[in-house]
Design a protein with these regions (language model features):
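Regulatory extensions appended to serine/threonine kinase catalytic cores
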Residues: 42, 46-84
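Short amphipathic alpha-helical segments embedded in low-complexity Lys/Glu-rich regions
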Residues: 33-44, 53-59, 136-138, 183, ...
């Protein structure tokens, strides 16, 4: 964190500082000791007999920032957390070092304008590499480095249209990019020429961490993610080219976690965010890239000017999403 506990809690009683330090220093999947945290404030309030507040249920809670697993629906999903205040949403763009290539972006694209942009890109030898959505409009990244042979897409009023996806699977197309809109709709891109041999996807009211864990054990890795409102869509594929994969999920942009993963050879390969949470999939590729440089950028508006600066350094958009970054 940029602001120290001393500064934030300088005018607060000592227990507040200790509480703050404990919580902010917890690990991603560490379960809080609620009894200990609550006991910090015993000296500041009246005895339990004079305060009619039940804390026994709080002691049973097993979550920190929605990270541990609880029983919810059939999948043991994270329960949604409600926080006060006005969260800020931004564009989160991820850039990878690549050999010089042609890349093109479009943003604030309405449904009826999407086809002309895609057709023009295809004519120029470009295929869609990633998509995103903000305010029910689409952002589209197309480039010459996908390796795809052909590509299909569908805009649907439902989030990840199952029948259409299954029809394309039958034709040996695989999902290569997805985006969800706040109105519940989605844009799904499926391609030929991928290394994938099998795919599975899940739509969930909360981040499907338990399902991801299950699929990891079956040899799948996350290859695409998106959100529609507060719903999550995650696509996992076999033969994705990764040896290991981890998740960073937080109410804020997890800068420290991402940098720590970078130091251990991971790179961001998927990202998605709701108005409440941001999730990043970081993977270790089986084949180490020649240049492992990766940068991220957070901007209030679509980063059109920044993209051109990145291109000048041979850094190209690899992932982009719009959602929660700061409280």
């Amino acid at each position: 964190m940029a602001t120290s506990p001393d500064m934030l809690c300088s005018f607060c009683p000592a227990p507040f500082k200790e509480f703050f330090e404990t919580v902010t220093n917890m690990k991603f999947d560490e379960e809080p000791n609620y009894a200990k945290l609550i006991s910090l404030f015993d000296g500041l309030i009246e005895s339990p007999a004079s305060r009619p507040i039940r804390i026994d249920e709080a002691l049973k809670v097993g979550q920190k920032r929605g990270r541990s697993q609880v029983n919810h629906e059939e999948d043991g999903q994270h329960k949604k957390k409600v926080r006060l205040g006005s969260p800020a949403s931004q564009w989160i763009s991820v850039y990878n070092a690549r050999r010089p290539m042609k890349q093109r972006y479009h943003y604030n694209v309405a449904d009826n304008r999407l086809q002309q942009h895609i057709e023009k890109g295809n004519e120029d030898g470009l295929y869609i590499s990633c998509v995103a959505s903000s305010a029910n409009l689409w952002a589209l990244i197309m480039d010459a480095g996908t390796g795809f042979g052909s590509q299909l897409y569908e805009i649907s009023t439902v989030f990840l249209h199952k029948d259409w996806i299954m029809d394309q699977w039958e034709k040996s197309f695989y999902i290569t990019a997805i985006a969800g809109a706040s109105n519940g709709g989605s844009l799904v891109v499926m391609s030929k020429g991928t290394p994938y041999t099998q795919q599975s996807y899940k739509v969930s009211e909360s981040f499907p961490f338990k399902w991801i864990n299950k699929k990891w054990k079956e040899g799948f890795h996350v290859t695409s993610m998106a959100t529609a409102g507060n719903r999550w869509g995650v696509v996992m594929s076999r033969n994705a080219g990764y040896s290991e994969q981890v998740v960073e999920l937080d109410f804020l942009y997890p800068s420290e976690g991402i940098h720590r993963r970078w130091e251990h050879g991971y790179r961001i390969t998927s990202s998605a965010a709701t108005s409440d949470q941001a999730a990043f999939i970081l993977s270790k590729p089986k084949r180490k890239p020649v240049d492992e440089t990766q940068e991220t950028l957070r901007t209030s508006a679509f980063p059109s000017n920044h993209v051109k600066d990145k291109w000048a350094k041979n850094l190209y958009i690899a992932s982009i999403c719009y959602g929660r970054t700061v409280s």
